[in-house]
């Protein structure tokens, strides 16, 4: 799956900008990135949302345990990969039909967060049990919400293209060609929200997240880590 967002929607994370500046490397534009995804995945589907957002996915080379799905409801777009262990109980909690799958559930959970503000954003993902990565884009508010499960069982990466777009994908090689060293693995147990202004841990929302510069031989430009209480105490 692939989500590409212009700087009008999300400001490129400073840590990824810095990583690309430390070790200059070839990049391509967001348009070239989307084109490459569509060309290398014959069954791919892409959706253009206005001038600033492109979402794409494919069932090609899909793991039976990590199926990809896409849905749109009430101008909320969602790409989901993985499976939820507690889908049944969550359907009841949100009053959904038994036919509702994970991607519909995530849209409803996000909508509950948006409409019940100030509802803590970490609650959207904190009660999801299983392995997952998802990208939510709310067209009505131009809000982006991205999350990865606490164990990082579903791969998710993010980077910055040559034209300053922020891209998320489950394929590191795809992003490497477009983002160079402005690339990192999306940290497990975390969510990124333009509504709250950045990256947070949904297990420990008050804990600081730092970006550690990666060695030159690594594919990444940086590694994001959630600091624990002991680490925070030592740095205060």
Question: Can you say where each PLM-predicted feature lies in the sequence?
Answer:
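Cysteine-centered catalytic environments shared across enzyme families
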Residues: 1-236
């Amino acid at each position: 799956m692939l989500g590409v967002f212009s700087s009008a929607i999300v400001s490129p994370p400073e840590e990824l900008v810095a990583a690309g500046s430390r070790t200059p490397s070839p990049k391509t534009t967001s348009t070239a990135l989307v084109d490459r995804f569509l060309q290398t995945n014959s069954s791919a589907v892409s959706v253009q949302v206005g001038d600033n957002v492109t979402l794409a996915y494919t069932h090609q080379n899909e793991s039976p345990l990590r199926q990809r799905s896409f849905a749109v409801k009430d101008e909320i777009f969602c790409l989901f990969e993985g499976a939820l262990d507690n889908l049944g109980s969550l359907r009841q909690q949100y009053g959904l039909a038994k036919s509702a799958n994970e991607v519909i559930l995530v849209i409803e959970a996000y909508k509950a967060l948006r409409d019940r503000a100030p509802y803590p954003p970490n609650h959207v993902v904190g009660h999801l049990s299983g392995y997952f990565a998802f990208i939510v884009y709310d067209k009505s508010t131009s809000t982006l919400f991205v999350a990865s499960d606490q164990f990082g069982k579903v791969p998710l990466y993010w980077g910055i293209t040559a034209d300053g777009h922020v891209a998320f994908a489950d394929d590191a090689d795809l992003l490497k060609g477009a983002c160079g060293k402005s690339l990192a693995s999306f940290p497990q147990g975390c969510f990124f929200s333009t509504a709250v202004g950045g990256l947070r841990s949904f297990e420990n929302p008050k804990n600081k997240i730092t970006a550690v510069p990666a060695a030159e031989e690594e594919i990444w430009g940086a590694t994001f880590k959630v600091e624990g209480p002991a680490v925070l105490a030592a740095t205060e």
